[in-house]
C-alpha cells in the first residue's frame, strides 16, 4: 500500500487534527509534509464527523432528548480533536476584541489563559451549534444529523485549507509559519473532496438548496473573516485557522437548516 497516497495522507491528517490512536507505521519513512498531507483534511474531518454522528445516534437511540444528543456529538468532536479548533476560536476572539494593536492582539492569542471574549464566544457558539443539530434531528431525523456532521466537518476543513492558502502569515517565524503553506493543487484537491462529502451529507435531507445555501454562506463568512484577519493582525495564525474551521462548520449547518 502506498503510504504517501491519499490513504496515508488521511491518516497523517488525522494525526495532526485529532488525538485518535493511529498506527505509527503510517508516519515512518513517508513524505509527512503537512502542507502536502493537508489535501486530506476534508477526509479526516469526515471521519471525525462520522464518529461524532455515531455518538449522536447512540444518544438518540437510548431516548436522550435532542439537546443532549447534540451536545454529546459536539463534546465528542472536541474530545477527539483535543478542542484544537475551539481553542483557536476562543484565542482569536480574545485577541481580536481584547486589544487595540496588532502586536498586542498576537500576544493575547499566544496566552493560554481564557478571557471574557473567548468564554462568551465559546458558550454562544456551542449553544447555536447544538440548536442547529437539534433542528436537524427534529425536522429530518438523527440519521440525517449524522450525515450532516460528516459533510459539515469535511467541508469546514476544506474551507480552512483555502483560508490557509490565501492569507500570509501574521507572525513570521512562528509555529504556524514554520508549517509552510499548501500549494494551489493541494487546495483544489481538498476542496473537491470537501464538496463531495458536503453533497453526500446534505443532499439526502436538504437537496440542492441546502448544498447551495451552505456553499454560499461558507464562502461569504470565510471571505469576511479573512478580511477581518488582515485588518486585525495582517494575516493568519494557527488560531485563526482553527477559528476558520469553526466558522465554516456553523455556516454550513445554518445553510442546511434553512433548507429543511
Curated annotation (Swiss-Prot):
Q: Where are the transmembrane segments?
A: 42-62, 64-84, 117-137, 144-164, 192-212, 214-234, 240-260
Enzyme type, top EC level = transferase
Its pathway is: Cofactor biosynthesis; adenosylcobalamin biosynthesis; adenosylcobalamin from cob(II)yrinate a,c-diamide: step 7/7
Q: For this UniProt entry, what's an example GO CC term? A: plasma membrane
Main localization of the protein? membrane
Localization, per the record, is: Cell inner membrane
Q: Tell me, which GO biological process terms does this entry list?
A: cobalamin biosynthetic process
Q: Which GO terms describe its molecular function?
A: adenosylcobinamide-GDP ribazoletransferase activity; cobalamin 5'-phosphate synthase activity
Chemical reaction(s) catalysed: alpha-ribazole + adenosylcob(III)inamide-GDP = adenosylcob(III)alamin + GMP + H(+); alpha-ribazole 5'-phosphate + adenosylcob(III)inamide-GDP = adenosylcob(III)alamin 5'-phosphate + GMP + H(+)
The protein's UniProt keywords, in alphabetical order, are: Cell inner membrane, Cell membrane, Cobalamin biosynthesis, Magnesium, Membrane, Transferase, Transmembrane, Transmembrane helix
Q: Does the keyword Transport apply?
A: no
The membrane topology of this protein is: Multi-pass membrane protein
Q: Cross-referenced Pfam families, in alphabetical order?
A: CobS
Enzyme Commission no: 2.7.8.26
Is Repeat among this UniProt entry's keywords? no
**Cross-referenced InterPro entries, in alphabetical order?**
CobS
What this protein needs as a cofactor is:
Mg(2+)
Known role? Joins adenosylcobinamide-GDP and alpha-ribazole to generate adenosylcobalamin (Ado-cobalamin). Also synthesizes adenosylcobalamin 5'-phosphate from adenosylcobinamide-GDP and alpha-ribazole 5'-phosphate.
| Family stated for the protein in its record | Belongs to the CobS family.
Q: What is this protein called?
A: Adenosylcobinamide-GDP ribazoletransferase
Task: Recite the lineage of the species.
Answer: Bacteria, Pseudomonadati, Pseudomonadota, Alphaproteobacteria, Hyphomicrobiales
Gene name, Swiss-Prot/TrEMBL:
cobS
Amino acid at each position: 500500500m502506498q503510504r504517501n497516497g491519499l490513504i496515508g495522507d488521511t491518516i497523517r491528517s488525522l494525526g495532526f487534527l485529532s488525538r485518535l490512536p493511529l498506527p505509527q507505521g503510517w508516519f515512518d519513512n513517508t513524505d509527512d509534509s503537512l502542507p502536502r498531507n493537508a489535501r486530506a483534511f476534508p477526509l479526516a474531518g469526515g471521519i471525525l464527523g462520522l464518529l461524532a454522528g455515531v455518538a449522536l445516534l447512540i444518544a438518540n437511540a437510548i431516548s436522550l432528548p435532542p439537546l443532549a444528543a447534540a451536545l454529546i456529538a459536539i463534546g465528542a468532536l472536541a474530545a477527539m480533536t483535543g478542542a484544537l479548533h475551539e481553542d483557536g476560536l476562543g484565542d482569536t476572539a480574545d485577541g481580536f476584541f481584547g486589544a487595540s494593536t496588532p502586536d498586542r492582539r498576537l500576544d493575547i492569542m499566544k496566552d493560554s489563559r481564557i478571557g471574557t471574549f473567548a468564554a462568551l464566544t465559546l458558550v454562544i457558539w456551542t449553544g447555536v451549534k447544538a440548536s442547529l443539530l437539534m433542528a436537524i434531528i427534529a425536522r429530518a431525523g438523527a440519521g440525517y444529523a449524522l450525515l450532516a456532521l460528516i459533510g459539515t466537518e469535511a467541508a469546514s476543513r476544506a474551507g480552512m485549507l483555502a483560508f490557509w492558502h490565501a492569507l500570509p502569515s501574521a507572525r513570521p517565524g512562528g509555529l504556524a509559519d514554520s508549517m509552510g503553506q499548501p500549494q494551489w493543487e493541494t487546495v483544489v484537491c481538498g476542496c473537491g473532496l470537501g464538496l463531495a462529502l458536503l453533497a453526500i451529507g446534505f443532499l439526502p435531507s436538504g437537496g440542492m438548496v441546502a448544498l447551495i445555501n451552505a456553499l454560499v454562506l461558507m464562502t461569504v463568512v470565510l471571505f469576511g473573516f479573512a478580511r477581518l484577519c488582515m485588518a486585525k493582525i495582517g494575516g493568519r495564525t494557527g488560531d485563526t485557522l482553527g477559528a476558520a474551521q469553526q466558522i465554516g462548520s456553523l455556516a454550513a449547518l445554518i445553510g442546511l437548516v434553512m433548507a429543511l
